[in-house]
């Protein structure tokens, strides 16, 4: 697998970062402060999971075609990141709603055979995704025939 670059380590990022850090071979976490990036992967003892201080110019010197960039930055930054992903032939994912600036990239994204995924935010995206992971983990610990009922409040169970 190519390198995955996760930008931003806010509270809603931590479950995703931790899951990827355990399961991926090539992960770099970028954050405004290096300390927060390091804390987000402090439980992982893998030399191929790195933490770096976010710098827009630096990250796009390190990406390679086919890499995946996940942006958890504020929505106003996503068009800038998406355009740079297109320029560097990287796949892009964000939690933000599809806006006109990102939508305008669609033709070029398709022509370059890239994947840009948006609107995978808390509801329904990440919240539902981590709900499935929670149930999957529970089933590993118990019988697969159990019934799981719970309520989710934006990631809080």
Regions found by a protein language model. Name each.
Residues 4-9:
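Conserved N-terminal Rossmann-fold NAD(P)-binding element of oxidoreductases
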Residues 12-15:
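Hydrophobic/small residue at the entry helix of a nucleotide-binding pocket
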Residues 24-41:
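NAD(P)-binding Rossmann-fold cofactor-contacting core
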Residues 45-58:
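Rossmann-fold cofactor-recognition segment
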Residues 67-72, 92-94:
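N-terminal Rossmann-like NAD(P) cofactor-binding module of classical short-chain dehydrogenase/reductase
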Residues 84-102:
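ADP-ribose/adenylate-binding Rossmann-like module
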Residues 96-118:
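Rossmann-fold NAD(P)-binding glycine/threonine-rich loop
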Residues 114-157:
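Rossmann-like dinucleotide-binding core of oxidoreductases
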């Amino acid at each position: 697998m190519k390198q995955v670059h996760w930008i931003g380590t806010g509270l809603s990022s931590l479950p995703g970062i931790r899951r990827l850090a355990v399961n991926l071979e090539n992960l770099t976490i970028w954050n405004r402060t290096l300390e927060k990036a390091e804390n987000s992967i402090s439980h992982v003892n893998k030399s191929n999971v790195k933490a770096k201080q976010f710098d827009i110019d630096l990250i796009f010197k390190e990406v390679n075609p086919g890499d995946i960039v996940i942006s958890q930055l504020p929505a106003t930054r996503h068009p800038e990141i998406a355009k740079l992903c297109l320029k560097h032939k990287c796949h892009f994912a964000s939690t933000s709603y599809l806006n006109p600036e990102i939508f305008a990239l669609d033709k070029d994204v398709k022509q370059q055979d890239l994947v840009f995924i948006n609107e995978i935010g808390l509801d329904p995206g990440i919240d539902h995704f981590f709900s499935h992971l929670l149930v999957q983990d529970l089933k590993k610990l118990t019988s697969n025939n159990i019934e799981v009922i719970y309520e989710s409040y934006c990631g809080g169970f």
